[in-house]
Amino acid sequence: MALQRTLSIIKPDAVSKNVIGEILTRFEKAGLRVVAAKMVQLSEREAGGFYAEHKERPFFKDLVSFMTSGPVVVQVLEGEDAIAKNRELMGATDPKKADAGTIRADFAVSIDENAVHGSDSEASAAREIAYFFAATEVCERIR
């Protein structure tokens, strides 16, 4: 097992349902520590830049529109195999295919409004964390 960091975003649909605390509790109960967090209202430029890898995909415009429709909570999670653990907690991208008890099965309504985002690899995690946080904003959690 390896100590990792991963980026997690609680998306506008979950923020508007007021389930931020419930989602964070799931991360912590699974052994993940929040080492950076903030609520932000993304601009079109910020959302478009974050999801730039999808720019040529047909859903890109709708994704940017959704991600700017309300505030999001962006956090860095740290723990043993944090990337895989977070993705397991999130569940399948399509909440209809997500296992019962996962974040998306419990809080998402559609593949478009699917409650959370999580990094899919160490390279993505490093890039995504740097997109939202300066190194000085990520705290060491020794205790």
Curated annotation (Swiss-Prot):
Changing E56D: No change in autophosphorylation. Strong decrease in alginate production. Signal peptide: none annotated. ATP binds at K11, F59, R87, T93, R104, N114. InterPro entries: NDK-like_dom (IPR034907), NDK-like_dom_sf (IPR036850), Nucleoside_diP_kinase (IPR001564), Nucleoside_diP_kinase_AS (IPR023005). Changing G21V: Lack of autophosphorylation and of kinase activity. Cleaved to 12-kDa form, but cannot form a complex with pyruvate kinase. Strong decrease in alginate production. Changing E80K: Decrease in autophosphorylation. Strong decrease in alginate production. Keywords: ATP-binding, Cytoplasm, Kinase, Magnesium, Metal-binding, Nucleotide metabolism, Nucleotide-binding, Phosphoprotein, Transferase. Its cofactor is Mg(2+). It holds the Pfam family NDK. Changing A14P: Lack of autophosphorylation and of kinase activity. Cleaved to 12-kDa form, but cannot form a complex with pyruvate kinase. Strong decrease in alginate production. One of its GO terms (molecular function) is nucleoside diphosphate kinase activity. It is found in: Cytoplasm. Belongs to the NDK family. HAMAP family: NDP_kinase (MF_00451). This is Nucleoside diphosphate kinase. It comes from Pseudomonas aeruginosa (strain ATCC 15692 / DSM 22644 / CIP 104116 / JCM 14847 / LMG 12228 / 1C / PRS 101 / PAO1). The gene is ndk.
